[in-house]
A protein has these predicted regions:
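Extracytoplasmic/secreted envelope proteins and their assembly/folding machinery
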Residues: 77-80, 84, 194, 220, ...
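Extracellular/periplasmic catalytic domains that process cell-envelope and extracellular macromolecules
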Residues: 46-51, 91, 139-144, 187-191, ...
Protein backbone atom coordinates (compact mmCIF):
# COMPACT_ATOMS: atom_id res chain seq x y z
CA UNK A 1 0.00 0.00 0.00
CA UNK A 2 1.16 3.49 -0.74
CA UNK A 3 0.02 6.22 1.63
CA UNK A 4 0.06 9.99 1.73
CA UNK A 5 2.02 11.74 4.46
CA UNK A 6 0.16 14.66 6.03
CA UNK A 7 1.87 17.38 8.03
CA UNK A 8 0.09 16.81 11.33
CA UNK A 9 0.92 14.81 14.42
CA UNK A 10 -1.94 12.46 13.69
CA UNK A 11 -0.40 11.49 10.39
CA UNK A 12 2.27 9.26 11.90
CA UNK A 13 -0.31 6.52 12.39
CA UNK A 14 -0.98 6.49 8.67
CA UNK A 15 2.31 4.70 8.06
CA UNK A 16 1.39 1.53 9.98
CA UNK A 17 0.43 -0.44 6.87
CA UNK A 18 2.21 -3.69 6.00
CA UNK A 19 2.39 -6.37 3.36
CA UNK A 20 0.28 -8.43 5.74
CA UNK A 21 -0.01 -12.16 5.98
CA UNK A 22 3.00 -13.14 3.90
CA UNK A 23 5.39 -16.04 4.48
CA UNK A 24 8.97 -14.80 4.81
CA UNK A 25 10.43 -18.32 5.01
CA UNK A 26 10.20 -19.41 1.38
CA UNK A 27 13.20 -19.33 -0.95
CA UNK A 28 13.08 -18.39 -4.62
CA UNK A 29 12.59 -21.34 -6.95
CA UNK A 30 14.55 -21.82 -10.13
CA UNK A 31 12.48 -24.37 -12.06
CA UNK A 32 10.22 -24.01 -15.03
CA UNK A 33 6.55 -24.00 -14.47
CA UNK A 34 3.20 -25.16 -15.64
CA UNK A 35 1.80 -23.49 -18.67
CA UNK A 36 -0.75 -21.29 -16.91
CA UNK A 37 -4.24 -22.50 -17.75
CA UNK A 38 -3.44 -26.18 -18.17
CA UNK A 39 -3.48 -26.03 -21.96
CA UNK A 40 -0.69 -25.85 -24.51
CA UNK A 41 0.09 -22.27 -25.47
CA UNK A 42 1.03 -21.40 -29.02
CA UNK A 43 3.70 -19.05 -27.68
CA UNK A 44 6.00 -19.86 -24.77
CA UNK A 45 7.88 -17.30 -22.74
CA UNK A 46 11.65 -16.99 -22.76
CA UNK A 47 14.01 -14.57 -21.05
CA UNK A 48 13.77 -12.40 -24.17
CA UNK A 49 9.97 -12.28 -24.32
CA UNK A 50 8.64 -8.72 -24.43
CA UNK A 51 5.31 -8.31 -22.65
CA UNK A 52 2.58 -5.91 -23.72
CA UNK A 53 -0.19 -6.16 -21.14
CA UNK A 54 -3.73 -4.91 -21.85
CA UNK A 55 -5.04 -2.66 -19.08
CA UNK A 56 -8.62 -1.91 -18.14
CA UNK A 57 -9.41 0.90 -15.71
CA UNK A 58 -12.65 0.17 -13.85
CA UNK A 59 -13.93 3.65 -12.95
CA UNK A 60 -16.55 3.53 -10.18
CA UNK A 61 -18.69 6.67 -10.00
CA UNK A 62 -22.02 7.80 -8.62
CA UNK A 63 -22.34 11.07 -10.58
CA UNK A 64 -20.87 12.06 -13.93
CA UNK A 65 -20.58 15.62 -12.65
CA UNK A 66 -17.92 14.58 -10.11
CA UNK A 67 -14.49 14.60 -11.86
CA UNK A 68 -12.83 12.75 -8.98
CA UNK A 69 -15.28 9.92 -9.59
CA UNK A 70 -16.04 10.10 -13.29
CA UNK A 71 -12.47 10.63 -14.44
CA UNK A 72 -12.32 12.94 -17.44
CA UNK A 73 -12.17 11.19 -20.80
CA UNK A 74 -8.69 11.31 -22.26
CA UNK A 75 -6.95 11.56 -18.88
CA UNK A 76 -6.28 7.88 -18.17
CA UNK A 77 -4.34 7.37 -21.44
CA UNK A 78 -2.00 10.15 -20.26
CA UNK A 79 -1.58 8.39 -16.92
CA UNK A 80 -0.74 5.07 -18.56
CA UNK A 81 1.70 6.74 -20.96
CA UNK A 82 3.49 8.24 -17.95
CA UNK A 83 3.55 4.85 -16.21
CA UNK A 84 5.16 3.31 -19.29
CA UNK A 85 7.78 6.06 -19.38
CA UNK A 86 8.59 5.54 -15.70
CA UNK A 87 9.09 1.80 -16.09
CA UNK A 88 11.01 2.24 -19.37
CA UNK A 89 13.51 4.51 -17.62
CA UNK A 90 13.78 2.74 -14.27
CA UNK A 91 17.36 1.56 -14.79
CA UNK A 92 16.60 -2.06 -15.74
CA UNK A 93 15.09 -3.62 -18.86
CA UNK A 94 11.80 -5.20 -17.80
CA UNK A 95 10.78 -5.86 -21.40
CA UNK A 96 7.35 -4.72 -20.30
CA UNK A 97 4.81 -2.24 -21.58
CA UNK A 98 1.16 -1.59 -20.81
CA UNK A 99 -1.49 -0.72 -23.36
CA UNK A 100 -5.13 0.27 -23.11
CA UNK A 101 -7.40 -2.67 -23.83
CA UNK A 102 -9.14 -2.31 -27.19
CA UNK A 103 -11.82 -5.00 -26.87
CA UNK A 104 -13.95 -6.11 -23.93
CA UNK A 105 -14.28 -9.75 -22.78
CA UNK A 106 -17.10 -10.31 -25.29
CA UNK A 107 -14.92 -9.18 -28.18
CA UNK A 108 -16.64 -5.81 -28.61
CA UNK A 109 -14.50 -2.84 -29.59
CA UNK A 110 -14.36 -0.47 -26.62
CA UNK A 111 -15.67 3.04 -27.42
CA UNK A 112 -13.27 4.40 -24.78
CA UNK A 113 -10.21 2.12 -24.96
CA UNK A 114 -9.12 0.70 -21.64
CA UNK A 115 -11.88 2.34 -19.59
CA UNK A 116 -14.85 0.51 -18.07
CA UNK A 117 -17.15 2.94 -16.27
CA UNK A 118 -19.38 1.49 -13.56
CA UNK A 119 -22.17 3.55 -12.05
CA UNK A 120 -22.66 2.70 -8.38
CA UNK A 121 -24.83 4.13 -5.63
CA UNK A 122 -21.89 5.10 -3.43
CA UNK A 123 -18.52 5.79 -5.04
CA UNK A 124 -16.57 6.23 -1.79
CA UNK A 125 -15.41 2.90 -0.38
CA UNK A 126 -12.80 1.23 1.79
CA UNK A 127 -10.24 -0.26 -0.59
CA UNK A 128 -9.19 -3.11 1.70
CA UNK A 129 -12.79 -4.20 2.17
CA UNK A 130 -13.28 -3.93 -1.60
CA UNK A 131 -10.36 -6.25 -2.39
CA UNK A 132 -11.64 -8.83 0.09
CA UNK A 133 -15.33 -8.76 -0.85
CA UNK A 134 -16.65 -11.51 -3.18
CA UNK A 135 -19.50 -9.18 -4.15
CA UNK A 136 -17.09 -7.12 -6.28
CA UNK A 137 -15.40 -10.03 -8.05
CA UNK A 138 -17.82 -9.87 -10.99
CA UNK A 139 -16.52 -6.44 -11.99
CA UNK A 140 -13.14 -7.92 -12.88
CA UNK A 141 -12.27 -8.94 -16.44
CA UNK A 142 -10.37 -12.17 -17.07
CA UNK A 143 -7.09 -11.66 -15.20
CA UNK A 144 -5.24 -13.93 -17.62
CA UNK A 145 -5.98 -11.39 -20.36
CA UNK A 146 -6.20 -8.00 -18.61
CA UNK A 147 -4.54 -6.06 -15.83
CA UNK A 148 -7.52 -4.77 -13.84
CA UNK A 149 -7.02 -1.36 -12.22
CA UNK A 150 -9.88 -0.08 -10.05
CA UNK A 151 -10.47 3.59 -9.31
CA UNK A 152 -12.79 5.06 -6.71
CA UNK A 153 -12.56 7.51 -3.84
CA UNK A 154 -11.12 5.96 -0.69
CA UNK A 155 -12.81 6.69 2.62
CA UNK A 156 -9.32 7.24 4.03
CA UNK A 157 -7.77 10.20 2.22
CA UNK A 158 -4.29 9.00 3.18
CA UNK A 159 -4.49 5.78 1.17
CA UNK A 160 -3.06 6.19 -2.33
CA UNK A 161 -3.36 2.58 -3.45
CA UNK A 162 -3.24 -1.12 -2.62
CA UNK A 163 -2.83 -4.28 -4.68
CA UNK A 164 -3.27 -8.03 -4.78
CA UNK A 165 -0.01 -9.96 -4.70
CA UNK A 166 0.51 -12.46 -7.55
CA UNK A 167 0.50 -16.22 -7.17
CA UNK A 168 3.07 -18.79 -8.08
CA UNK A 169 1.82 -22.20 -9.20
CA UNK A 170 3.02 -25.45 -7.65
CA UNK A 171 5.80 -26.53 -7.78
CA UNK A 172 7.13 -23.00 -8.35
CA UNK A 173 8.10 -20.78 -5.44
CA UNK A 174 9.01 -17.11 -5.17
CA UNK A 175 9.91 -15.89 -1.70
CA UNK A 176 7.22 -13.79 -0.07
CA UNK A 177 4.51 -14.65 -2.61
CA UNK A 178 1.45 -16.90 -2.07
CA UNK A 179 1.31 -20.22 -3.91
CA UNK A 180 -1.50 -22.08 -5.66
CA UNK A 181 -1.30 -25.86 -5.42
CA UNK A 182 -3.46 -26.31 -8.51
CA UNK A 183 -4.47 -24.17 -11.46
CA UNK A 184 -7.98 -22.73 -11.43
CA UNK A 185 -9.63 -20.54 -14.08
CA UNK A 186 -9.78 -16.82 -13.41
CA UNK A 187 -13.58 -17.07 -13.35
CA UNK A 188 -13.28 -18.90 -10.01
CA UNK A 189 -11.44 -16.06 -8.27
CA UNK A 190 -13.79 -15.19 -5.42
CA UNK A 191 -12.48 -11.69 -4.78
CA UNK A 192 -11.36 -8.74 -6.96
CA UNK A 193 -7.79 -9.70 -7.92
CA UNK A 194 -6.59 -6.27 -9.03
CA UNK A 195 -4.67 -3.07 -8.49
CA UNK A 196 -6.45 -0.16 -6.79
CA UNK A 197 -5.58 3.55 -6.83
CA UNK A 198 -7.40 6.37 -5.08
CA UNK A 199 -9.18 8.53 -7.66
CA UNK A 200 -8.90 11.56 -5.35
CA UNK A 201 -5.35 11.99 -6.67
CA UNK A 202 -5.80 10.88 -10.26
CA UNK A 203 -5.03 14.37 -11.58
CA UNK A 204 -1.72 14.67 -9.68
CA UNK A 205 0.04 13.74 -12.91
CA UNK A 206 3.72 14.71 -13.06
CA UNK A 207 3.20 17.97 -11.12
CA UNK A 208 5.69 20.80 -11.50
CA UNK A 209 6.73 20.54 -7.83
CA UNK A 210 7.07 17.42 -5.71
CA UNK A 211 3.89 15.85 -4.32
CA UNK A 212 3.70 12.70 -2.22
CA UNK A 213 0.35 12.01 -3.93
CA UNK A 214 1.82 11.99 -7.47
CA UNK A 215 -0.27 9.37 -9.30
CA UNK A 216 2.43 7.88 -11.55
CA UNK A 217 4.62 6.90 -8.61
CA UNK A 218 1.60 5.49 -6.80
CA UNK A 219 0.41 3.43 -9.76
CA UNK A 220 3.90 2.13 -10.60
CA UNK A 221 4.33 1.14 -6.94
CA UNK A 222 1.06 -0.83 -6.87
CA UNK A 223 1.65 -2.48 -10.26
CA UNK A 224 5.07 -3.57 -9.01
CA UNK A 225 3.39 -5.17 -5.97
CA UNK A 226 1.04 -6.94 -8.40
CA UNK A 227 4.13 -8.24 -10.20
CA UNK A 228 5.83 -9.62 -7.10
CA UNK A 229 7.76 -6.80 -5.42
CA UNK A 230 7.69 -5.90 -1.76
CA UNK A 231 8.55 -2.68 0.05
CA UNK A 232 12.20 -1.68 -0.03
CA UNK A 233 12.22 -0.81 3.69
CA UNK A 234 12.25 -3.38 6.50
CA UNK A 235 9.07 -4.99 7.82
CA UNK A 236 9.08 -7.39 10.76
CA UNK A 237 8.12 -10.90 9.53
CA UNK A 238 5.97 -11.58 12.61
CA UNK A 239 4.44 -8.26 13.65
CA UNK A 240 4.83 -6.43 10.29
CA UNK A 241 6.15 -3.45 12.23
CA UNK A 242 8.32 -0.98 10.31
CA UNK A 243 10.36 -0.29 13.45
CA UNK A 244 12.97 -2.87 12.52
CA UNK A 245 16.47 -3.05 11.09
CA UNK A 246 16.18 -6.03 8.76
CA UNK A 247 16.02 -6.58 5.00
CA UNK A 248 12.73 -8.19 4.01
CA UNK A 249 12.15 -7.57 0.30
CA UNK A 250 14.22 -10.59 -0.84
CA UNK A 251 16.45 -8.32 -2.94
CA UNK A 252 20.01 -7.89 -1.69
CA UNK A 253 20.65 -4.98 -4.06
CA UNK A 254 18.03 -2.67 -2.49
CA UNK A 255 19.25 -0.96 0.70
CA UNK A 256 16.87 -1.29 3.63
CA UNK A 257 16.13 1.19 6.39
CA UNK A 258 14.04 1.65 9.53
CA UNK A 259 10.81 3.17 8.25
CA UNK A 260 9.44 4.06 11.69
CA UNK A 261 12.52 6.10 12.59
CA UNK A 262 12.47 7.79 9.20
CA UNK A 263 8.79 8.70 9.64
CA UNK A 264 9.59 10.46 12.91
CA UNK A 265 12.31 12.42 11.13
CA UNK A 266 9.97 13.22 8.26
CA UNK A 267 7.26 14.40 10.63
CA UNK A 268 9.61 16.89 12.25
CA UNK A 269 10.73 18.27 8.87
CA UNK A 270 7.50 18.12 6.87
CA UNK A 271 6.54 21.45 5.23
CA UNK A 272 3.28 22.45 6.86
CA UNK A 273 2.43 24.63 3.88
CA UNK A 274 2.67 21.49 1.73
CA UNK A 275 5.32 22.99 -0.56
CA UNK A 276 8.42 20.91 -1.24
CA UNK A 277 11.42 22.80 -2.56
CA UNK A 278 14.05 20.86 -4.51
CA UNK A 279 16.42 21.31 -1.58
CA UNK A 280 13.91 19.91 0.90
CA UNK A 281 13.14 16.92 -1.34
CA UNK A 282 16.85 16.16 -1.58
CA UNK A 283 17.14 16.35 2.21
CA UNK A 284 14.10 14.18 2.93
CA UNK A 285 14.97 11.62 0.26
CA UNK A 286 18.13 10.71 2.16
CA UNK A 287 17.97 7.48 4.17
CA UNK A 288 20.30 5.55 6.47
CA UNK A 289 20.92 1.90 5.62
CA UNK A 290 19.93 0.08 8.81
CA UNK A 291 22.38 -2.76 8.11
CA UNK A 292 25.50 -0.77 7.21
CA UNK A 293 24.87 2.73 8.57
CA UNK A 294 25.63 4.20 5.15
CA UNK A 295 23.62 7.08 3.73
CA UNK A 296 21.75 6.64 0.46
CA UNK A 297 19.18 8.50 -1.62
CA UNK A 298 15.76 6.89 -1.97
CA UNK A 299 14.99 6.38 -5.65
CA UNK A 300 13.28 2.99 -5.53
CA UNK A 301 9.73 2.63 -6.81
CA UNK A 302 9.04 0.30 -3.86
CA UNK A 303 9.70 3.01 -1.30
CA UNK A 304 7.37 5.93 -0.57
CA UNK A 305 6.96 9.00 1.64
CA UNK A 306 9.55 11.38 0.15
CA UNK A 307 11.37 9.47 -2.58
CA UNK A 308 12.18 9.97 -6.24
CA UNK A 309 10.38 6.67 -7.05
CA UNK A 310 12.04 6.24 -10.43
CA UNK A 311 14.30 3.17 -10.22
CA UNK A 312 14.23 -0.60 -9.81
CA UNK A 313 17.17 -2.89 -9.12
CA UNK A 314 18.37 -5.90 -11.16
CA UNK A 315 17.08 -8.33 -8.53
CA UNK A 316 13.70 -6.60 -8.50
CA UNK A 317 13.68 -6.91 -12.28
CA UNK A 318 14.38 -10.64 -11.93
CA UNK A 319 11.40 -11.06 -9.59
CA UNK A 320 9.09 -9.23 -11.98
CA UNK A 321 10.28 -11.34 -14.91
CA UNK A 322 9.76 -14.50 -12.85
CA UNK A 323 6.14 -13.52 -12.20
CA UNK A 324 5.51 -12.42 -15.79
CA UNK A 325 6.76 -15.74 -17.11
CA UNK A 326 5.07 -17.96 -14.53
CA UNK A 327 2.22 -16.39 -12.57
CA UNK A 328 -1.20 -17.65 -13.74
CA UNK A 329 -3.25 -14.44 -13.36
CA UNK A 330 -0.79 -12.13 -15.08
CA UNK A 331 -1.43 -11.74 -18.83
CA UNK A 332 1.07 -12.98 -21.38
CA UNK A 333 2.90 -16.16 -22.39
CA UNK A 334 4.31 -18.52 -19.76
CA UNK A 335 7.38 -20.72 -19.83
CA UNK A 336 7.16 -24.23 -21.24
CA UNK A 337 7.82 -27.11 -18.88
CA UNK A 338 9.92 -29.82 -20.46
CA UNK A 339 9.71 -32.23 -17.56
CA UNK A 340 6.61 -33.55 -15.81
CA UNK A 341 5.51 -31.19 -13.02
CA UNK A 342 5.67 -32.38 -9.45
CA UNK A 343 2.16 -33.52 -8.48
CA UNK A 344 0.32 -31.29 -6.06
CA UNK A 345 -0.64 -32.84 -2.71
CA UNK A 346 -3.77 -34.97 -2.97
CA UNK A 347 -7.07 -33.36 -2.01
CA UNK A 348 -10.44 -34.75 -1.13
CA UNK A 349 -12.68 -35.32 -4.12
CA UNK A 350 -14.43 -32.10 -5.12
CA UNK A 351 -12.56 -30.00 -2.56
CA UNK A 352 -10.64 -27.04 -3.96
CA UNK A 353 -7.89 -25.04 -2.36
CA UNK A 354 -9.12 -21.67 -1.08
CA UNK A 355 -7.33 -18.83 -2.81
CA UNK A 356 -4.49 -17.69 -0.50
CA UNK A 357 -5.17 -14.05 -1.40
CA UNK A 358 -2.72 -11.58 0.09
CA UNK A 359 -2.96 -7.82 -0.18
CA UNK A 360 -0.01 -5.45 -0.35
CA UNK A 361 -1.02 -2.94 2.30
Amino acid sequence: MKKLFFGSLLSLALFSCSDGGDDFTENPGDGDVNNGDGTENVEYATEETAYEIPVVFHVFYSQKSQPLEYVEEGHLPKVLDAVNRRFANCGVDLKLQFKLAEVDPDGNVMPEPGVDRQKVRIATMNSTEFLKDPAYAHYMWDQTKYLNICLFKEKNDAVLGISSFPYTLHPDTLAGMPKLMEMRPASELDYPHCVYVNSRYIYDLEPESYKTSEIVGSLCHEIAHYLGLRHAFGEDPVTYSRDCDIDTDFCDDTPTYNKAKYDQYLLSNYPYNGVFTDELVAQLAERTNSLTGEKFVSTNIMDYAVSYLNELSPQQCARIRYILMRSPYVPGPKVKRDDAPTPAPARSAGKKQPFPHRIAY
